[in-house]
Amino acid sequence: MSSNKINKKSIARIAAIQAIYQHMLRNNDNIDDIIENVLSFYRNDTSMTDSPIKISLTISHFKMLVKLVFENIDKIDEIISNHLVNDKNQNHIPILLQALLRSGICELLFFPDIPTKVIINEYTDIANDMLNDHEIGFVNSILDKIAHENKRFYDK
């Protein structure tokens, strides 16, 4: 019997999106409490006993990603706002899409050791599982533009 596994960093990214989303819904709950809440889900093996897929995450990547998002939230949100068209503001973007973009942009800006193409592909794949087709294209487009603007696209 073979064991299916999902990449631990991929799960860390999904968990980060969950934490960011939770923070946005709860109107600024303590980040450390939210991190622990999300981690408790992944530590609780009984919640996934029927799953044929082994799910675990890179805790250090998850924690660093969430903390960096909130330490740099103004910069990240400004970048998102600068990429909106037709006079839309960030309040018109669904919360889940905002959470995903915040996490992806944070990785592009503050995780230079991770290849840009990996970041863009990972967040596009995650978007594919969570968002509609228009939003998936939006995620891919924004992350690609930000990577080019920050001269990260051809780095690795």
Curated annotation (Swiss-Prot):
<protein>
    <recommendedName>
        <fullName>Transcription antitermination protein NusB</fullName>
    </recommendedName>
</protein>
<keyword id="KW-0805">Transcription regulation</keyword>
<dbReference type="Pfam" id="PF01029">
    <property type="entry name" value="NusB"/>
</dbReference>
<dbReference type="GO" id="GO:0003723">
    <property type="term" value="F:RNA binding"/>
</dbReference>
<dbReference type="GO" id="GO:0005829">
    <property type="term" value="C:cytosol"/>
</dbReference>
<dbReference type="GO" id="GO:0031564">
    <property type="term" value="P:transcription antitermination"/>
</dbReference>
<dbReference type="InterPro" id="IPR006027">
    <property type="entry name" value="NusB_RsmB_TIM44"/>
</dbReference>
<keyword id="KW-0804">Transcription</keyword>
<comment type="similarity">
    <text>Belongs to the NusB family.</text>
</comment>
<dbReference type="InterPro" id="IPR035926">
    <property type="entry name" value="NusB-like_sf"/>
</dbReference>
<comment type="function">
    <text>Involved in transcription antitermination. Required for transcription of ribosomal RNA (rRNA) genes. Binds specifically to the boxA antiterminator sequence of the ribosomal RNA (rrn) operons.</text>
</comment>
<dbReference type="InterPro" id="IPR011605">
    <property type="entry name" value="NusB_fam"/>
</dbReference>
<dbReference type="GO" id="GO:0006353">
    <property type="term" value="P:DNA-templated transcription termination"/>
</dbReference>
<keyword id="KW-0694">RNA-binding</keyword>
<keyword id="KW-0889">Transcription antitermination</keyword>
